[in-house]
Amino acid sequence: IQSLDRIPEENLDEIVSDMSLEQSATYLKNHYKINKQEERIISEVLNFISDFYEYEVNLMPGFKEFISHYDSINVIGTSCDEELVKIALNRLAVLNYFEDIITCSKVNKSKNDPDFYLACAQVLKQRPEDIVVFEDADYCIDVARKVGFKVIKIKDWRDLNEKCINDCGK
């Protein structure tokens, strides 16, 4: 946005964090009056964030230790680009722990839409009440709980213990 001589909103990250890339591009185009096609905006956004995913993004503390102890089917539900997520997970040596990556773009729903979580349940072939969602964003926690998922709020994976898992965030 700054490269277009526009001042980004202070909370722009929060605004677009639950949107698909397509939704983000439309928002940016309309809100900042950008005279480019959405496809071009998406391309520029991906170029901007790809280095971060490829070289800088890290796991939350304790995540690798946590996931290595559980033999369950795991999927990632994310608003990020699937290829960028795969690059990061591969670099961090945890890609093999996941069966699938469900993106907002793949299901054409944002993470603030209950259908996003229901699509993840379909991939897992499980009912929402039989799935535990680990989430760090409050708005996502509320949406997932509303459609019957058990949710555990995560800020640091080292904080998880057996009681937390058994309670499933109730």
Task: Give short role names for the model-derived ranges.
Residues I7-E9, Y27-K64:
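Metal-dependent phosphoesterase signature
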Residues I1-E14, K146-V147:
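Active-site neighborhood of HAD-like aspartate-dependent phosphohydrolases
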Residues E14, N74-G77, V133-F134:
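Conserved SAM-binding loop
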Residues S3, E65-S72:
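A short, Lys/Arg-enriched amphipathic alpha-helix followed by its capping loop at the start of a domain
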Residues I1, S20-N35, A88, C120-A121:
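Helix-loop "lid/cap" segments that line or gate small-molecule binding pockets
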Residues K64, S68, D81-E82, K86-K170:
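Asp-based, Mg2+/Mn2+-dependent phosphohydrolase catalytic module
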Residues R6, I34, S72, Q126, ...:
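Short glycine/serine/threonine/alanine-rich loop segments
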Residues V16-S20, E44, N58-G62, C80, ...:
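Short beta->alpha linker loops
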